[in-house]
From Swiss-Prot:
Family, per entry: Belongs to the Fmt family.
Recorded GO MF terms: methionyl-tRNA formyltransferase activity
Protein name according to UniProt: Methionyl-tRNA formyltransferase
EC supergroup of this enzyme: transferase
Species name: Clostridium novyi (strain NT)
One Pfam family cited in the UniProt record for this chain: Formyl_trans_C
Keyword GTP-binding attached: no
Keyword set, alphabetical order: Protein biosynthesis, Transferase
InterPro entries: Fmt, Formyl_trans_C, Formyl_trans_C_sf, Formyl_transf_N, Formyl_transf_N_sf, Formyl_transferase-like_C_sf, GART_AS, Met-tRNA-FMT_C
Residues forming coiled coils: none
Record-linked CDD domains: FMT_core_Met-tRNA-FMT_N, Met_tRNA_FMT_C
Enzyme nomenclature, EC number: 2.1.2.9
């Protein structure tokens, strides 16, 4: 079974490894090397590193639409499947028609919900209790193709986007292998997505990370979980940015102004919200490492009755 794999970040690495272990990977397409770090040295994508370790040919077009020579290379490979996992480019129709069987995409949501760039983050921000991976046939739209297989993951009240990312990342490779085998044996009937049930998971940005304490404690807690590890929800204390990595909700109410620090202890910082109370457990100030509140207050103070903004 000849596979061409297209992917870029760490999330795609277990899927590539699963392809290498189970099929014949004839080529890997990934994004061009990018400047990274203070020295701005060119760095390979995680997918490229794994491809080179396995002596697989690597192709790095800036744009498949504008570099037809890469499409010709794809045609020459004559793949049975093109497998796409967080590649970072929308494939032209000409590419979608190349493989013998299909172009299959692994998407980190239970489609049709959360099409788009940041599905697992928005699932947590919106307080979903389940997420998962979906394999789908690719078409010219954005995550709109027919669904093939899904796998579900429960989201508990403390799970962060980073933790959900790692679970889906590891499980995705197995789902892809299963999908390919069942497509070849004719065991899968593609299912059209119900567009009336879709919602779009837009890219994250730092502007959305500023906490609005007039919202409910549950909403703020979900924002904190959904933006961990990036861009990380934040507020201001004593005119300094205070990032918040972990929290939990108290089923109590306060008549204090939203954002008011009610109490500080080893268990965390109790903060009044528009509805309910949030207990902040892990924080970070500029130039410092993230610390549990218990560690932070050993040498620093957070004033009770101060207002976070």
């Amino acid at each position: 079974m000849k596979i061409v794999f297209m992917g870029t970040p760490e999330f795609a690495v277990p899927s590539l490894k699963a392809m290498v272990e189970n099929f014949n990977v004839e080529g890997v397409f990934t994004q061009p090397d990018r400047p990274k770090g203070r020295g701005k040295k060119l760095a390979m994508s995680p997918v490229k590193e794994v491809a080179l370790e396995n002596n697989i040919d690597v192709y790095q077009p800036v744009s498949l639409r504008k570099e037809p020579e890469f499409i010709e290379k794809l045609k020459n490979i004559q793949p049975d499947f093109i497998i796409v996992v967080a590649y970072g480019q929308i494939l032209p129709k000409e590419v979608l028609e190349i493989p013998k069987y299909a172009c299959i995409n692994l998407h980190a949501s239970l489609l049709p919900k959360y099409r788009g760039a940041a599905p697992l983050n928005w699932a947590i921000i919106n307080g979903e209790k389940k997420s998962g991976n979906t394999t789908m046939l690719m078409d010219v739209g954005l995550d709109t193709g027919d669904m093939l297989m899904t796998q579900e993951v429960d989201i508990n009240d403390s799970m962060t986007a980073g933790e959900l990312h790692d679970i889906l990342m590891i499980q995705g490779g197995d789902l892809l292998v299963d999908t390919i085998n069942k497509m070849v044996s004719g065991e899968i009937t593609p299912i059209k997505q119900d567009d009336s049930k879709t919602c779009y998971a837009s890219m994250l940005d730092k502007k959305m990370a500023c906490i609005d304490w007039s919202k409910s404690a549950s909403e703020i807690h979900n924002l904190i979980r959904g933006l961990n590890p990036w861009p990380v929800a934040y507020t201001h204390y004593d005119d300094k940015v205070m990032k918040i990595y972990k929290s939990h909700v108290l089923n109590e109410n306060s008549k204090k102004e939203p954002g008011t620090v009610i109490n500080v202890s080893n268990k965390g910082i109790k903060v009044a919200c528009g509805e309910g109370i949030l207990v902040v457990e892990e924080i970070q100030f500029p130039g410092k490492k993230p610390l549990k509140v218990e560690q932070y207050i050993r040498g620093n103070s957070i004033e009770i009755e101060s207002v976070l903004k």
